[in-house]
Amino acid sequence: MSRIGKSPVQIPEKVSVDIKGLSITVKGPKGELKRLMPEGVNFDQKENQIVVTPATTKRYSRERHGLCRTLISNMVQGVTEGYEKKLEIVGVGSRAQVKGKNLVVSAGYSHPVEMTPPDGITYKVESNTNVTVSGIDKEIVGNEAAKIRSIRPPEPYKGKGIKYQDERIIRKAGKSGKK
């Protein structure tokens, strides 16, 4: 049995969970999330917690046990607290700004790169070099942050590029010149 899947998901007072077959809807103060769960897992809602159990003893059912529990936990946390990823832009002349809802990144190309956020995602820019991506769905927040980082990933020689705020770039030594 999955060690993660064994523990029940606690549901705060402000959150309501609706389970219909494999479809789970979580509503909270920040919004609503709906997700279709994979087969092979049963969900039991008891008072203020959800217990996830494998439907059978087969391997595919046990594999999805911990996954489904974590997905539900992430949904509950998303509608109560939300998620955010912070990125840093390093390099001379590289900066970001918000135009309306869109994020415009100048990262050393001949043209600025404009990104339109999906529903439920907001971009915030502090001091032209710090970008915050926030929303209620952990997966979408992470994907959007990864798309922004992929515009100009950090390079190992000088560290220029777009990186996550807590990311450590492993630096390389440059070429040693002739003497």
Curated annotation (Swiss-Prot):
GO terms for molecular function: rRNA binding; structural constituent of ribosome. Keywords: Ribonucleoprotein, Ribosomal protein, RNA-binding, rRNA-binding. Disulfide bonds: none annotated. The keyword Ribosomal protein applies. Gene3D superfamilies: Ribosomal protein L6, alpha-beta domain. One of its GO terms (cellular component) is cytosolic large ribosomal subunit. This is Large ribosomal subunit protein uL6. It comes from Prochlorococcus marinus subsp. pastoris (strain CCMP1986 / NIES-2087 / MED4).
